[in-house]
UniProtKB/Swiss-Prot annotation:
Cofactor: Zn(2+)
Amino acids binding Zn(2+): 16, 18, 37, 40
Matches recorded under InterPro entries: Ribosomal_bL28/bL31-like_sf, Ribosomal_bL31, Ribosomal_bL31_A, Ribosomal_bL31_sf
Function: Binds the 23S rRNA.
Name under which the protein is recorded: Large ribosomal subunit protein bL31
The record's free-text note on cofactor binding: Binds 1 zinc ion per subunit.
Keyword presence, Ribosomal protein: yes
Any one Pfam family match given in the protein's UniProt record, by short name: Ribosomal_L31
Protein family membership: Belongs to the bacterial ribosomal protein bL31 family. Type A subfamily.
UniProt GO molecular function: metal ion binding; rRNA binding; structural constituent of ribosome
SUPFAM superfamilies: L28p-like (SSF143800)
Entry-linked NCBIfam families: L31 (TIGR00105), PRK00019.1 (NF000612), PRK00528.1 (NF001809)
Native species: Histophilus somni (strain 2336)
Keywords for this protein: Metal-binding, Ribonucleoprotein, Ribosomal protein, RNA-binding, rRNA-binding, Zinc
Length: 70
């Protein structure tokens, strides 16, 4: 590898809005503030909610379906 052309690889901290602090290494060179992390994201915590579309699929099918010839 060529010397002097690669960015510095520094240790940084990524701080989540929930208070979780993650130490990692990066070429960014500054600490990061995160909105969500694996401690507070609904997918990882098991608190994921299913969004109900309120019958939109049925309403679409009713509106645009071709009447059956039975």
């Amino acid at each position: 590898m060529k010397q002097g052309i690669h960015p510095e690889y520094k240790e940084i901290t990524a701080t989540c809005s929930c208070g979780n602090v993650i130490k990692t290494r990066s070429t960014v060179g500054k600490n990061l503030n995160l909105d969500v992390c694996s401690n507070c994201h609904p997918f990882y915590t098991g608190k994921q909610r299913v969004v109900d579309t309120g019958g939109r699929v049925e309403r679409f099918n009713k509106r645009f379906s071709i009447p059956s010839s039975k």
